[in-house]
């Protein structure tokens, strides 16, 4: 059970919500603020004075006054008309994060929503009744309206859900959770819809995957150093301390740790080779830069996870209603775009190491890592697959945040595209997973070919894991299943665990 303290969520909590079957409860310390916000909205609605989002229309229709007897209909219509998402359902892990983030934002007491509505969301979450939310349809301002409308529609008994993974109607979902459809009161529909929770959830969910891939890439890169008979001298701490970047210093330390005591490395220490290619030698510089970007993105996303991104905002202590733009997800878009750059570079560097390993003139290994080359093609086309994926990632890494299209009759004339920025991270991560799987296979093959010498004590278990699932490549065979099984292990963090390094979300 995780206790949500609004405004004080942590990265480890968010990773657990996404990855583990934890349940949620709301910190009772938040109840007074929630109730005060709801009372403030009720008082404003009772007075009848115009207040945006409470008794007016929305967007370009904000100047239209809504009579008191139509306020509930206004909120219902808002939810139903905004539930216009398209595409595949959002991943279960992202929906869980989205719901938790929405609860945290509402729980800070500046949205004017009743606890009854929040309790219904928690009940659905804990019953494993998750809204079916189409993943496409948000421009990241005014908030993630369409995705959050699909979440909110379920509370009204409209739309679809997944009940313990099985697709069903919203009414069936409410029934399983022991709930009845809600009638939303003044401002409640808007409070549910306005916010950056979809883009932030997608960015966090994919960031956790990219963190796992980063650790895997450290391991794969170290194994490739041994496979290519590369030097460990470029990882000397003194080199990296002179430059001073934290990520670079820590990445170099990880490579030193992983390669310490390698018999392969000791066997060629006195060779006449002066320098390795950049894909081996400059790993700390590249991976360190990726690490620094990822950490910055994590800092930004954690702030956003704890933010109130509603509009308008209720200040119960003064009774004021202030309209602003906290729903604009530009910080999330920038963070997601930075993550895309890092994830694409992780894959790009791994692809270059694969290319090095299969090139006999660079690696000193048999061409394409197979004996009897010619009749056997070995890793030739596996590298082509890695190249195709790395190239695709370069296109996907183009920043979404540089684009904007005006919406709502030019009332919302600049938008963030944060949801797309966050969503495409999943494709980049998936591509990078397969690139790393191919590298792990190629590096393991190269290490085998260095016999009688072996890799380091830290990397020996990695070799054992690979070889327990995929045999040494002797002759050409149907290769795709080999890549698939190692990619599955990459996704399960089987290799990430070997990295002497962890992110804040894992602590």
Swiss-Prot record:
Catalysed conversion reaction: L-histidine = trans-urocanate + NH4(+)
PTM annotation: Contains an active site 4-methylidene-imidazol-5-one (MIO), which is formed autocatalytically by cyclization and dehydration of residues Ala-Ser-Gly.
Localization per record: Cytoplasm
The keyword Membrane appears for this protein: no
Biological process according to GO: L-histidine catabolic process to glutamate and formamide; L-histidine catabolic process to glutamate and formate
GO molecular-function terms, A-Z: histidine ammonia-lyase activity
Modified residues (2,3-didehydroalanine (Ser)): 142
Pathway the protein contributes to: Amino-acid degradation; L-histidine degradation into L-glutamate; N-formimidoyl-L-glutamate from L-histidine: step 1/3
Keywords noted in UniProt: Cytoplasm, Histidine metabolism, Lyase
Top-level lineage group: Bacteria
Enzyme superclass (EC): lyase
CC terms in the record's Gene Ontology section: cytoplasm
HAMAP family: His_ammonia_lyase (MF_00229)
Family: Belongs to the PAL/histidase family.
Protein name in UniProt: Histidine ammonia-lyase
Source species: Burkholderia ambifaria (strain MC40-6)
Taxonomic lineage: Bacteria, Pseudomonadati, Pseudomonadota, Betaproteobacteria, Burkholderiales
């Amino acid at each position: 059970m995780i206790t949500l303290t609004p405004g004080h969520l942590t990265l480890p909590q968010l990773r657990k919500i996404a990855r583990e079957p934890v349940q949620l409860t709301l910190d009772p310390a938040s109840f007074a603020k929630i109730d005060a916000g709801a009372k403030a909205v009720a008082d404003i609605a009772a007075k009848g004075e115009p207040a945006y989002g409470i008794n007016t229309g929305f967007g370009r229709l904000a100047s239209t006054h809504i009579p008191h007897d139509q306020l509930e209909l206004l909120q219902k219509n808002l939810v139903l008309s905004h539930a216009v998402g398209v595409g595949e359902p959002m991943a279960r892990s992202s929906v869980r994060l989205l719901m938790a983030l929405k609860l945290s934002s509402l729980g800070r007491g500046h949205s004017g929503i009743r606890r009854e509505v929040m309790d219904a969301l928690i009940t659905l979450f804990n019953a494993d009744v998750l809204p079916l939310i189409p993943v496409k349809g948000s421009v990241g301002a005014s908030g993630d309206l369409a995705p959050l409308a699909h979440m909110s529609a379920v509370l009204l008994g409209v739309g679809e859900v997944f009940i313990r993974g099985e697709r069903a109607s919203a009414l069936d979902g409410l029934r399983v959770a022991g709930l009845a459809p809600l009638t939303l009161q003044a401002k409640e529909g808007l409070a549910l819809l306005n916010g950056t929770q979809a883009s932030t959830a997608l960015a966090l969910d994919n960031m956790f995957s990219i963190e796992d891939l980063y650790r895997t890439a450290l391991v794969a890169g170290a194994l490739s150093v041994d496979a290519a008979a590369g030097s460990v001298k470029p990882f000397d701490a003194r080199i990296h301390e002179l430059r001073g970047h934290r990520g670079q210093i820590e990445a170099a330390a990880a490579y030193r740790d992983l390669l310490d005591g390698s018999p392969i490395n000791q066997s060629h220490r006195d060779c006449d080779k002066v320098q390795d290619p950049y894909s081996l030698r400059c790993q700390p510089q590249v991976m360190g830069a990726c690490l620094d970007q990822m950490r910055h993105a994590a800092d930004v996303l954690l702030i956003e996870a704890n933010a109130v991104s509603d509009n308008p905002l209720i200040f119960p202590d003064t009774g004021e209603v202030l309209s602003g733009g906290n729903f604009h997800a530009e910080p999330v878009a920038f963070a997601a775009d930075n993550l895309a750059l890092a994830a694409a570079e992780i894959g790009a560097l791994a692809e270059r190491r694969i290319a090095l390993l299969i090139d006999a003139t660079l690696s000193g290994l048999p061409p394409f890592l197979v004996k009897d080359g010619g009749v056997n093609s070995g890793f030739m086309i596996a590298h082509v697959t890695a190249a195709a994926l790395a190239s695709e990632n370069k296109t996907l890494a183009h920043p979404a945040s540089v684009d904007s299209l005006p919406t709502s009759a030019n009332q919302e004339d600049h938008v963030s595209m944060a949801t797309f920025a966050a969503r495409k991270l999943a494709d980049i991560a998936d591509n990078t997973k397969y690139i790393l799987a191919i590298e792990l296979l190629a590096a393991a093959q190269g290490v085998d070919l260095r016999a009688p010498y072996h890799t380091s004590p830290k990397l020996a278990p990695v070799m054992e894991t690979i070889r327990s699932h995929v045999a040494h490549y002797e002759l050409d065979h149907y290769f795709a299943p080999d890549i698939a099984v190692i990619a599955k292990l990459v996704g399960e963090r089987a290799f990430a665990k070997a990295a002497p390094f962890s992110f804040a979300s894992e602590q």
